[in-house]
Amino acid sequence: MGLIAGGLGQILILMDLPIILGCAIAIAFCIYLSGAYHEDGLADMADGFGAGGDGRRISNIIHDSRLGTYGVSALSLAIIVRILLVSSLVETGLWLFVIMGSGLAVGKGFVMINRRLFEVSEFAGTATVSFLGSNIRQIVCLLLWFLPCLFIFSLEQLALGIFLCVLVSLWCGFRAKFYLGGITGDILGATAFLTELAFFLGILLLA
């Protein structure tokens, strides 16, 4: 999805569309292709943790179809930051489809890592429980997602980007464990989104 959406945005940029606008269109198209799963998870997590309370109350808020002030604020800021980070990376000379493809790959990789590290909450749906899959498949997927990054970014950029991703993913996981007793699908979606931003930030800081 990142490659497709990023490819569209790259074409628009090559047609002299402003970089920030091309990136915004690419990100919007990526959200459409993915069904906004990660964005929904981030908004739900912000609503639940922002409102507070015991695990059941937070879970009810997370699974509520309504979007609250915390969710709107977090999602709006996150999308703005994502557009700014991606457009800034494009201005350094990187191709848009490379940036978006690698960012989504890293985010999904940390989703799998957190799914391994943390227990599943009693409030999680069946999709979260069945997400794990076999060990071999998970290892192959992680290699396919992470190895291309070695040929795109410098080792220093990767080290800082992955370090920031680790901090963010652990924060999401331990916060979910403290409030919900474990992770849920929404927490994993938020983890993917936030680690993607952390990865972009790490790459940009050493660009």
What is each PLM-predicted segment?
Residues 47-51:
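N-terminal transmembrane-helix/juxtamembrane module of multi-pass inner/ER membrane proteins
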Residues 1-35, 53, 64-65, 70-207:
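Hydrophobic alpha-helical transmembrane segments
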Residues 57-60:
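Coiled-coil dimerization/phosphotransfer module
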